């Protein structure tokens, strides 16, 4: 197994953070929208799709920050590797949503550095509470993200087949990440913390739709 020193790991995370916030992340898998015919959207529908996909892109910026922080401060190598693997898979989502935003003639959230910093802080706190609680944070996060993506599939214009294809694959991946964290011994997040996470998510999604 390749040994990665703490300094090398820091450099990797720093490089990843720069790529995440600058919008130059590269996907390791083809976009689910590849080969899907682009439906005809009027201006209002295009703006609405762009707003929802911007929210989804912000979610992936936050996912990158969370996983990087949790990997950085994980207490065991196995958990660290799981966070790093999930982070690489989530980077696909980041690239896919950024590409779709460009196709819709829009842009990522202007507040991405703020979202990233806040999510990294939350991930650090979760990791410091121990691996079981950190994994539980992943399970709850992925559960909320899955619900949010499924809601978006109902809110996107039905003819926006490209965005729908991306969101559907993202939802399936989130389920897999949550299941993997659960299998590693996740400890459930307390109800009060769940409500706090939902409140933070509401602020983020409402703001990112417009900015």
Swiss-Prot record:
* Main location as per UniProt: membrane
The reaction(s) this protein catalyses: a 5-methoxy-2-methyl-3-(all-trans-polyprenyl)benzene-1,4-diol + AH2 + O2 = a 3-demethylubiquinol + A + H2O
**Residues given in the record as Fe cation 1 binding sites:** 60, 90, 93, 174
Q: Which cofactor does it need?
A: Fe cation
Q: Which UniProt keywords apply?
A: Cell membrane, Iron, Membrane, Metal-binding, Monooxygenase, Oxidoreductase, Ubiquinone biosynthesis
What subcellular compartments does it reside in? Answer: Cell membrane
Co-factor binding comment: Binds 2 iron ions per subunit.
Might you give the EC number(s) for this enzyme? 1.14.99.60
Q: Which GO terms describe its cellular component?
A: plasma membrane
A biological process from GO: ubiquinone biosynthetic process
- Residues at which Fe cation 2 binds: 90, 142, 174, 177
Identify the domain of life: Bacteria
Short name of one Pfam family for this protein?
A: COQ7
Q: According to Swiss-Prot or TrEMBL, what is its membrane topology?
A: Peripheral membrane protein
For the protein in the UniProt heading, the enzyme class is: oxidoreductase
Which Gene3D superfamilies does this UniProt record tie to the protein?
Answer: 1.20.1260.10
List GO molecular-function terms, semicolon-separated.
3-demethoxyubiquinol 3-hydroxylase activity; metal ion binding
According to its UniProt record, in which pathway does this protein act?
A: Cofactor biosynthesis; ubiquinone biosynthesis
Q: Which NCBIfam families match?
A: DMQ_monoox_COQ7
Query: What family does this chain come from, according to its entry?
Result: Belongs to the COQ7 family.
HAMAP family of this UniProt entry? COQ7 (MF_01658)
Functional summary from the UniProt entry: Catalyzes the hydroxylation of 2-nonaprenyl-3-methyl-6-methoxy-1,4-benzoquinol during ubiquinone biosynthesis.
Q: What is this protein called?
A: 3-demethoxyubiquinol 3-hydroxylase
Organism per entry: Herminiimonas arsenicoxydans
Q: Give the lineage.
A: Bacteria, Pseudomonadati, Pseudomonadota, Betaproteobacteria, Burkholderiales
